[in-house]
A protein has these predicted regions:
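Carbohydrate-interacting/catalytic domains
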Residues: 1-10, 15-31, 297, 308-474
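Active-site/binding-pocket entry motifs
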Residues: 15, 43, 277-280, 412
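Soluble or luminal CAZymes and related metallo-dependent hydrolases
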Residues: 18-19, 65-68, 132-137, 182-189, ...
Length: 474
């Protein structure tokens, strides 16, 4: 799949959508490109949320029939929405009718009893060195691709596959033949999985949920790496939440959490998430934030906007029962993301991002540019995470020209206070942020504003010199 296209994923549990056409209508109204379903394979443990798969080739009976699910996928495809499934090839549950000692011997699980059971979850770990196990998991991936025409997988707990010591204390694990903690058999399985899926089903998205800092996980198999398309950026989510959940007066001490992600943003191709597993429902997200109800909502809008404007693929999960104002907000964020190449075309290239303000600790403001190779597609973005509103906030700009606000999270139609910039502004020749030109704008409290940038047209000196002058001979 090309990484130069916008990808905005809606995370949800399929049980929340019971009426025909309801999910497709919601996704179309809010502007998402993809939906990611929590596991749809059969499971027994209700408390697992589906992540303890018991029958890999069966749709859970909680969701209706296979024909129903197939029809749902087709309905979403007709609206141009891709379908991604959460998939659990890292471990399987222990129960009498399951895969554990399927024929009386350790057939699917790791042969070594000390390494077969994961101490954190009490589940069994697959033996990726077994050709039968590899074929079982590969055939399962192709089953969902071929039978239901899904468009990708998010692999859960990839770090439990890659690291022999994941979640284990010293003495609870055995090193590989080189004396290190990498599961070499799992590494080869993932390389094979990613390469064969992409060869057989071009365009399928393969996303890894991995927090163990495996190097270059999204680099190609040809370069001897794992070949995933994207990796969840758990660090980005953790850093942002650790910043916005503290009281505004204390945020200056956590300001670096806002900017830290750009130190590693181009080491992988990331998915940025503010989903159910990160913040819970919208109500639960609001409860985590300081301030009045209005201020809490403003901060949620600012967090969503910061995610959408930061380099990386997007994944959010606003409630299906969210207000019309929030629906309009998500729609406009997605519409801007999809229509502005600067927000996606150079996601994997550091030339597509440039800081303007990233040391405003006391003000809790960051400003940056998103760019393409075309100067006229540049976007100026200013994010204010403080309760202070500004009537004339100055920021340095990349060049002389006209700047027009195309998005403001404080717009009244989103439930904001309406601190917006209604007229286009011309940059002035006044130094700011070590730049020759600057701009003064209204900047709302807990607000994010985005300006399009039109360079000043310069009159060609060649044309002036070559201008014909009519000389009077009188």
């Amino acid at each position: 799949v090309s990484r130069e296209v916008p990808v905005s994923v809606y995370e949800t549990d399929i049980t929340e959508w019971k009426k025909h056409g309801e999910l497709a209508a919601f996704l179309k109204e809010t502007g998402y490109t993809h939906v990611e379903f929590h596991p749809v394979m059969e499971y027994l443990d209700q408390n697992s949320g589906g992540y303890s798969t018991s029958s890999y080739f069966a749709l859970t009976n909680r969701f209706g029939t296979p024909a129903d699910f197939r029809a749902l996928v087709e309905e979403l495809h007709q609206e141009g929405i891709g379908v991604i499934l959460d998939w659990t090839p890292a471990q399987f549950p222990r129960f009498d009718a399951g895969l554990e000692k399927f024929d009386g011997t350790p057939l699917y699980e790791v042969q070594d009893p000390a390494m077969a059971v994961h101490p954190m979850w009490g589940t069994m770990l697959y033996n990726y060195g077994s050709p039968m196990v590899k074929d079982f998991l590969l055939s399962n991936a192709f089953f969902w691709l071929d039978e239901f025409h899904v468009d990708g997988f998010r692999l859960d707990d990839v770090d439990a596959m890659l690291y022999l010591d994941f979640g284990r204390e010293a003495g609870q694990w055995r090193p590989n033949l080189y004396g290190s903690n990498e599961n070499l058999q799992a590494v080869e399985f993932l390389k094979h999985l990613n390469s064969i899926v992409k060869k057989r089903n071009p365009g399928v998205l393969l996303i890894a949920q991995e927090d163990g800092l495996w190097p270059q996980l999204t680099d190609s198999v040809e370069n001897d790496h794992l070949g995933f398309d994207y990796k969840w950026s758990g660090g980005w989510t953790k850093d942002l939440l650790s910043y916005i959940e503290v009281e505004p007066l204390e945020r200056k001490d956590y300001y670096d959490q806002l900017t830290l992600s750009m130190m590693y943003a181009y080491s992988e191709h990331y998915v940025l998430t503010l989903g159910r597993r990160d913040v819970g429902t919208l109500k639960e997200f609001l409860e985590k934030l300081p301030g009045s109800p209005k201020q809490k909502l403003a901060q949620v809008r600012a967090a969503y906007a910061y995610l959408m404007l930061h380099p990386g693929v997007k994944m959010t999960a606003p409630d299906k029962e969210c207000t019309e104002e929030m629906k309009a907000y998500i729609h406009d964020l997605n519409a801007m993301y999809r229509s502005c190449p600067a927000l996606y075309a150079m996601d994997g290239n550091s030339d597509g991002f440039e800081w303007i303000q990233f040391t405003n600790y006391d003000e809790n403001i960051v400003a940056f540019l998103r760019k393409t190779e075309k100067m006229e597609e540049t976007l100026l973005i200013v994010c204010n995470f403080s309760p202070v509103s500004y009537d004339s906030y100055q920021v340095g700009v990349p060049f002389a020209g006209k700047y027009k606000e195309i998005f403001n999270s404080d717009n009244g139609k989103y439930g904001g206070l309406g601190v917006v910039n209604t007229r286009a502004k011309n940059a002035v020749h006044a130094e700011c942020d070590n730049r020759e030109n600057s701009l003064k704008m209204k900047l709302p409290a807990y607000g994010v504003t985005v300006f399009s940038c039109t360079p000043e047209k310069k009159v060609s000196s060649v044309k002036r010199v070559g201008k014909k002058v009519k000389i009077s001979r009188k």
